Regions:
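Extracytosolic ligand-binding ectodomains
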Residues: 1-192
């Protein structure tokens, strides 16, 4: 469980080990610090138990995390009511009202009779990222395509706007989802 001292004050930073099941001592320390929110960049297996135990201890502040929370099992582990007032960032949401996203969702649903998830959207985007690089390279030569990929700047895709930085890391949009009564609900999109 982390905080970002350059954004907000950070009253405490705690850690846990994967596969832990009892978080009471850690949560007791966190509760004593009276935080504004708790950030857990973990996976649903532990996060579900942490949130359940936190709510049982009376910790009602928002919890925030990332795509490691994105599993139906999180709801089973935490309980739908305990997930209220929790938020995650993810790559995409089928509820995003953006017109291009809704066209993608409709086309995917028409073909596969289900809504696309984040992995479907990322797969779709990876094809268009490569297509864009090939077109800008004017070639399918691997070195030219690699160089074009590295120069990607402000490419608008289904999962958001993507640029590649000097270390070859993607700088991209993040979709904020909120849990309401056990369901992920689109909250907002943060662009770089």
């Amino acid at each position: 469980m982390m905080c970002f001292p350059y954004v907000l004050s950070c009253p405490a930073e705690e850690a846990y080990v994967a596969k832990d099941t009892d978080f009471s001592s850690t949560l007791t320390r966190i509760k004593s610090e009276n935080p504004e929110f708790v950030f857990i960049p973990g996976y649903y297996e532990e996060v579900g138990l942490i949130i359940k135990q936190a709510r049982e201890m009376g910790i009602t502040v928002p919890f925030m995390g990332a795509d490691g929370w994105d599993s139906p099992k999180l709801i089973e582990l935490a309980g739908a009511e305990n997930l209220n007032n929790t938020y995650i960032t993810n790559h995409y949401s089928s509820e995003d009202p953006d017109e291009n996203i809704q066209k993608f969702v409709q086309a995917f649903n028409d073909k596969y009779s289900k809504s696309p998830d984040a992995f479907n959207a990322l797969g779709y985007d990876s094809v268009y990222l490569l297509k864009d690089a090939i077109e800008r390279a004017g070639s399918t030569d691997s070195e030219k395509v690699k160089d074009a990929l590295a120069e990607t700047k402000d490419l608008s895709l289904i999962t958001g706007v993507v640029s590649i930085d000097e270390n070859h890391n993607p700088i991209k949009s993040a979709t904020v989802l909120e849990y309401k009564d056990g369901k992920q609900v689109f909250n907002s999109k943060v662009n770089p």
